Amino acid sequence: MAGSKACALFVVASLFGSGLAAAAEQPSAAQMMDDLMYGRGPVGGPFTLTDQTGKQRSDTDFRGKLMIVYFGYTYCPDVCPTDLMAITQALDALGPAAGEVQPVFITIDPERDTKVLADYVSAFHHSLVGLTGSLDEIRKVANSYKAFYVKVQDERSGDYSIDHAGVIYLMGRNGEYLGFMPPQTNPNRLTEVLRKSLAK
């Protein structure tokens, strides 16, 4: 998607500007963003996770619709709620056509998020599905989407935050990767991209 590459470079620069290093079990932020921008290898793939109601859901459940996939966490103070609200506004702007789009929020913090996931997703679009799983399951799905994230421990408080790329993924009706949009994409731009994708 035109314009996404330049913004994605800012995402990578921001991550490294914070002095972050990628977790050992995943590629670096720069490598994953390069793979996304330049189409190096597949993006997405099969998964089976648990939704906010406790039901197992797989990627095949959403076939026949466009799928918006967003990796984030409920304790995220700014980027996640901003992006999820933009997705909500874009879907509202689509009107009845929004029924052909399935938004999916995959938590990258299942240790804290699983119990509060239902309440969290209810604050956004009514069709938003929240997905959780074990740490290994989430990492596997994130890696298949080339979604970078790393836990950052605060030694003083004993708490942690999670740094992540906040990329908005768009998947086709058959689960194929269509492209990505950077964090804080304008809702009007999201609506435009969705309309064009639905028309194909």
Give the positions of each predicted feature.
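Short loop/turn microsegments at loop-to-beta-strand junctions
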Residues: 44-45, 67, 165-167
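Short active-site neighborhood of thiol/selenol oxidoreductases, capturing the structured segment around
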Residues: 59-81, 87
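Sec/Tat signal peptide C-region and signal peptidase I cleavage site
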Residues: 19-23
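Thiol/disulfide oxidoreductase modules built on the thioredoxin-like
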Residues: 137-193
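Bacterial N-terminal signal peptides
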Residues: 7-18
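N-terminal "domain-start" segment that seeds a small globular fold
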Residues: 25-60
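Structural microenvironment flanking redox-active thiols in thiol-disulfide oxidoreductases
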Residues: 82-141
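N-terminal secretory signal peptides that target proteins for export/translocation
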Residues: 1-3
